[in-house]
Regions:
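Cyclic nucleotide-binding regulatory module and flanking cytosolic helices
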Residues: 4-52, 101-103
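Hydrophobic residues at beta-strand termini and immediately following loops
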Residues: 48-50, 91, 124
Length: 170
């Protein structure tokens, strides 16, 4: 697993203070999600600053870390054959990245994600996150609801473009 430079979380209070810096519904969601978080998750979490255009996750690399997005924005990116970067999705509604693969039991990340502006994250080792969330009914239900909302929205968007004429897409 990766080793991160950053501020290591020592107490639940410190962990929740980081989450409470977040604004609005995102803060409410994260507070509910981590209401019964285990000490092991807190002690393993590291606060990390990420610069704009820095990769957080790279497709094909081992799925070893889950990231809580505290501040900033992230986007899914793909490299085309000519070396151009294609931004395919803004993850503004995603508060956590890196756990879809855990739920689907993939060993490697399926997408590359980079910061679309300077961002702050909490990095949690995937194995510790998984041990916690699969035994915390509250967190598991909240996370599954969020994942299903995202997937449903993506599929609706895919269908919209699938039935457009080439002229309309351009």
């Amino acid at each position: 697993e990766r080793v991160f430079r950053g501020i290591k979380m020592e107490t639940k209070q410190q962990f929740l203070e980081e989450i409470n810096k977040v604004k609005g519904s995102k803060r409410d969601y994260l507070n509910k999600l981590f209401q019964y978080v285990l000490e092991a998750v807190i002690r393993a979490a590291v606060h990390k600053n990420v610069k704009k255009d820095e990769f957080i996750i790279r497709a094909g690399e081992p799925c070893d870390t889950v990231y809580i997005i505290l501040k900033g924005d992230v986007a899914g990116v793909d490299y085309q054959k000519l070396g151009k970067v294609y931004y395919f999705m803004d993850f503004a509604k995603m508060y956590i990245v890196g756990d879809f693969e855990i739920f689907s039991e993939d060993t490697n990340y399926n997408v590359s994600i980079c910061a679309s502006k300077d961002s702050e994250l909490l990095a949690i080792p995937a194995s510790i996150y998984w041990k916690w969330i699969k035994h915390d009914e509250n967190a598991l239900l909240l996370r599954i609801k969020n994942i299903m909302t995202i997937l449903t929205s993506e599929k609706a968007s895919d269908r919209k473009y699938m039935f457009m004429s080439c002229k309309s897409v351009l």
